[in-house]
């Protein structure tokens, strides 16, 4: 049987309705993902979450954001809205990857495994990356062959995480009913790009 991993990308209150960068449908997607994990947990050899965990991300944050390269303050490390969505937190998933501490980071593969809520220094984050405490290392150690990606937002961090998994040689699926884009237009563009890179878009 193929070794499979499930990556739950950035399902945080900051990206759900009422959050700083709330996406319409975010809370509903969080609940659907939680139901899926409860029903299919045994199908996966490795499950992880990712989180935006911004400490001082430079010009990724802006008071006058363009919503392309710069954004309002969001995913601020140590705040309730940067925590996992309650529906996901209740699953007690073992592996958590924090990303974007000191720079923009859209892919879960840019993060480090951190199963606490530490506010690390720039040097500590760099040391963790250098030591290989990354999603790529974790998937390799688990002998994973296929990666399923779900979460928020399909048009941004889900897409970039899926593309990085594909570049690393994994068979990749994105469950389209377990993700939501920032907008319909950006979602369609993301799906076109993912399909062009041999990522399978399927219903869960």
What are the residue ranges of the model-derived segments?
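Acidic/histidine-rich helix-loop elements
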Residues: 16-26
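Active-site alpha/beta core segments
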Residues: 31-146
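Short, glycine/acidic-enriched loop or turn micro-motifs at the edges of active sites
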Residues: 13, 55, 154, 180
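Short, flexible loop segments at boundaries between secondary-structure elements
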Residues: 173-187
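Active-site flanking residues adjacent to catalytic metal/cofactor-binding acidic residues
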Residues: 9, 51, 176
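Extreme N-terminal starter segment of soluble prokaryotic enzymes
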Residues: 1-6
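Histidine-anchored nucleotide/phosphate-binding helix
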Residues: 35-37, 158-167
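Short acidic-hydrophobic, aromatic-tinged amphipathic segments that line or gate anion-handling sites
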Residues: 200-204
């Amino acid at each position: 049987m193929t070794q499979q991993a499930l990556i739950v990308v950035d399902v945080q209150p900051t990206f759900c309705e009422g959050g700083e960068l709330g996406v319409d449908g975010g809370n509903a997607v969080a609940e659907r993902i939680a139901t899926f994990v409860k029903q299919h947990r045994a199908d996966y050899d490795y499950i992880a979450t990712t989180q935006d965990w911004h400490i001082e991300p430079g010009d990724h944050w802006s008071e006058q954001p363009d919503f392309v390269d710069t954004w309002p303050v969001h995913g601020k490390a140590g705040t309730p809205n940067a925590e996992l969505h309650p529906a996901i937190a209740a699953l007690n998933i073992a592996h958590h990857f924090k990303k974007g501490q000191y720079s923009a980071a859209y892919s879960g593969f840019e993060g480090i495994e951190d199963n606490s809520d530490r506010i690390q220094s720039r040097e500590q984050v760099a040391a963790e990356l250098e030591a290989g405490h990354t999603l790529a290392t974790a998937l390799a150690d688990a002998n994973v062959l296929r990666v399923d990606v779900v979460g928020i937002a399909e048009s941004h961090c889900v897409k970039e995480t899926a593309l990085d998994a594909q570049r690393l040689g994994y068979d990749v699926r994105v469950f389209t009913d377990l993700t939501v884009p920032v907008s319909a237009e950006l979602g369609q563009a993301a799906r076109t790009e993912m399909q062009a890179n041999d990522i399978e878009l399927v219903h869960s």
